[in-house]
Amino acid sequence: MSFSGTYVEAIRQALFDAMEADPRVCCLGEDIGAYGGAFRATTGLLERFGPDRVIDTPISEQAIVGSAIGAALMGQRPVAEFQFMDFALLAADLMVNFAAKAHWRWGAAVPAVFRGPAGAGNGGGPFHSRAVGVSSH
């Protein structure tokens, strides 16, 4: 399948496709509902899938990740969005020591996606422009 569009449009289409294909897929994050996300990657999801599957969260990356892990352990397929990847580090403990190790700790799968923009070049300064993945190599 070929796609002709922007990176954000491709992400949005992938989310729509996943949510259409599997009713267990849900999205959660800051301002992802009516606002459509910081970079508009979730525009239209709330209108199409409703507030039970498109969940606006408080400004707490730990709460977003913890909720996604819990939802995944209960059979959902959450896609958790960080407004900016800089703040993913605030929830790194949960992603590394709970989500990633659940298989070895409890024999459980955590089918969750944690995503967000990095190094977008939007002039966001030291707390909204970092490419966190570079730090993990």
Where are these regions (language model features)?
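Thiamine diphosphate
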Residues: 1-137
